[in-house]
């Protein structure tokens, strides 16, 4: 997905900031990451409250390889229909935003 695609998807619901990371893009709303895009796939933030909903739909978590191990992050694939249908995207976005809001903010590193 291009940055334009991400803006088109998210901006009708909330102002977003995009930042490059993991060879992909992170999507921020109100200073919190709500999604990551890697290799054209969008993964939405989950937590213990929202993860079961994603699992019920058979959606897969974001994984990557590090030091010979498979690492799993708390982001799940977005359903295919949500890419093209704003009405289908809205509830999934809401779940991701709520999960991000419940997560503690990362502490800022002290400047030297």
Model-derived regions: residue spans:
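Charge-dense, helix-prone N-terminal extensions
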Residues: 1-112
């Amino acid at each position: 997905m291009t940055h334009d695609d991400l803006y088109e998807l998210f901006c009708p619901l909330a102002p977003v900031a995009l930042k490059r990371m993991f060879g992909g893009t992170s999507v921020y709303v109100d200073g919190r990451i709500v999604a990551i895009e890697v290799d054209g796939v969008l993964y939405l933030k989950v937590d213990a409250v929202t993860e079961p909903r994603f699992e019920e739909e058979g959606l897969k978590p974001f994984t990557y390889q590090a030091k010979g191990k498979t690492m799993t992050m708390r982001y799940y694939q977005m359903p295919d229909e949500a890419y093209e249908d704003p009405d289908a995207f809205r509830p999934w976005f809401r779940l991701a935003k709520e999960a991000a809001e419940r997560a503690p903010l990362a502490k800022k590193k002290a400047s030297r």
